[in-house]
């Protein structure tokens, strides 16, 4: 929503915002964009506006929203506003899937820029080489992450329905978002319905090995207007796979060779396999992984370099907190020294043989020098409850 506010400001709108808490770097970005915002949803924070764009974290019980509705003001969801004001006039390349959306979206934007395009883009992360997470231009292309999470309190469809993509890239489909989905079939159904709505002259690219056979077969049997293309990517390296996906997504614009050349100076996105400390004794990596598959892929990349690994996983996502991934996590945790953050009492019992809940005392042990350089991997989509800062302080002693 912060990026959307900045886009609206760049288009010339007067923009105000409100959130429960606003932290850096977003608070800094909003201030530098000249966007005034309030913290807290008290009724007094209402600002007279022509339209109120409502984020999907806002429930209909929100006090400020209640006041907006009482005053009979016009409300719209973020994805709906984006389509009505921008996407309806663009060629939309939508990057979807359980994992890798931010990385692949940023790769596409990066490759286009390095090949003299000025693409519109909206990325749910902070690319290290690009100036910001969004861009608005006169270019016909708009690259966007296509999230399967719900849109708004009054629209429980996935956000991606609003984007009406010309090119849809499906990187992978796994079970996630256990707070709104009961099983993977419900998620697949939404992807299937999205594909059915896509018109002729559109295209769907699917990473073949990362979706279920039943989903593939169902699509193959359906009479679709769109062109369906299953991608067989001959690599086991997740970084190389993401680059190939990016190349396929924009193959109508530039050649694969030019895309790969354009990605030679790509250095990633903040909080995606980001090294935040490195010396002769320790490397600390921060990663947004909050699903077992993403954690496994991240560990695999580290294992190619070292076997001296300490894993710290924050159980912060809705699916993690609900315990739907506990069995897979046990299999992951047993392969290295592992600590958890925010595990429930029941999860602590389940993980007790292979992992323990992180404490301040453990940090001293983790940050003790070994004969061999140690890599500490912290995975999660929250803030690690302050433990990351404590580890950094200990490593810097």
Language-model segments: what does each one mean?
Residues 1, 61-62, 83, 130, ...:
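Short, well-ordered alpha-helical microsegments
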Residues 20-23, 41-43, 56-60, 80, ...:
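Short, polar loop motifs at secondary-structure junctions
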